[in-house]
Amino acid sequence: HLGRKWGCKTVAEIADLWPESIVAYGIAGPHNPAVLALRRLEKWIYKKADALIFTMEGAYDYIVEQGWEKEIPRAKVHYINNGVDLEQFDYNKEHFRVEDPDLNDPNVFKVIYTGSIRRVNNLGLLLDASKCVKDPRVKLLVWGDGDERAALEQRVREEHIGNVTFKGRVEKKYVPSIVSRADLNFAHNSFTYLFNYGISFNKLFDYFAAGQPILCDFPCRYNPVVTYGAGTEVRDPQPQEVAAVIDHLSEFSD
């Protein structure tokens, strides 16, 4: 309507698939009246826009699976992923440095996770994998917070998982200092079929900017970590498999 009123083109940017995300995470079923109403709105937006920009590379696969390809042509669908301001990243890396004994220890193989610590993030798998790691130099260092943190810290204490440390939350400006000193940055989340359309986590681009290897432990049809040779993907995210990859990569730091 605004496009017609002002005589201009309309471009819609889609960073998340709604309402599909509601269904994928089990918040509501596909036939829920609210989901059906949002689906109609979603299709209307896609049809009326002159161009669509998705942050997921495989978003047109989703459109095809919905049966909308005749009304929404491929030519008007574009992919622009999230990103990071490299100048700001480098500035923050130099001016907001985190002083941490593990980060500063050259004898520690630092596997770093930054981000939310909620049930959907499934950090319990990382604890299970850490228990299977054989290299004594490996430490999983977790920066972030969330409602699952206390329970996971309790697991670490009760199960004597000595190679995992929760560091707490830091301001975003300190993240470049942390991830740039990793030996391995960990891109981790609970798998959902939405990943088949691509991934564009903000923290993933912090990892790219850091220039350190990335371990991605969930299968993904469009994975920029693999596409651009920025790290390794674990197709079967079981604790033993993840631990084996970490042990293998730690050998290269000798």
Give the role of each language-model region:
Residues 2-8, 32-52:
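Membrane-proximal helix-turn-helix segments that form the acceptor-binding/catalytic region
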Residues 58, 80-83:
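Carbohydrate-associated surface elements
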Residues 64, 83-100, 122:
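Acidic anion/phosphate-binding donor-loop and adjacent secondary structure
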Residues 71-72, 91-110, 250:
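Nucleotide-sugar donor-binding and catalytic loop/hinge architecture
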Residues 102-130, 141:
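Conserved donor-binding/catalytic core segment of Leloir-type glycosyltransferases
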Residues 121, 171-178, 185-208, 215-226:
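Nucleotide-sugar-dependent
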Residues 135-141, 150-184:
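Nucleotide-activated donor-binding/catalytic signature segment of Leloir-type glycosyltransferases, i.e.
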